[in-house]
């Protein structure tokens, strides 16, 4: 039963998927890799807790690789993203480095296909 799963936090929430290209409103999505110094006795949890509480943050993941976290944020402009990284994220004491990646085009998100590839309608020219 859905109500029981909601009560037990098995279903954690619902969200709306918006195709911003169709709305005509610009939205910038950034995936920020963050390298940190884990805190003694707390590991990564306290840093993750601090980062996830920023309103701009949509997702925070602990990842394996050269960086420790992947932080996904959205803003209306590149300047908003830049301000978040330089004025909020990078100044956190245990943050060592960040690498910001901007989403150029979205093909699929949360299982939803956003843009179906169009068929190439050019004619083949053969000698």
PLM features: residue spans?
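A compositional/biophysical signature of low hydrophobicity enriched in polar/charged and small residues
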Residues: 1-127
């Amino acid at each position: 039963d859905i109500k029981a799963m909601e009560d037990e936090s098995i279903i954690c929430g619902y969200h709306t998927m918006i195709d911003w290209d169709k709305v005509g409103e610009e939205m910038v999505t950034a995936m920020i890799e963050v390298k940190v110094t884990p805190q003694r006795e707390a590991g990564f949890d306290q840093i993750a807790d601090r980062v996830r509480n920023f309103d701009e943050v949509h997702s925070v993941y602990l990842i394996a690789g050269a960086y420790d976290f992947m932080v996904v944020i959205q803003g209306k402009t590149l300047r908003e993203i830049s301000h978040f990284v330089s004025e909020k994220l990078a100044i956190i004491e245990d943050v060592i480095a960040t690498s910001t990646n901007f989403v150029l085009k979205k093909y699929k998100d949360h299982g939803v296909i956003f843009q179906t590839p169009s068929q190439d309608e050019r004619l083949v020219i053969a000698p």
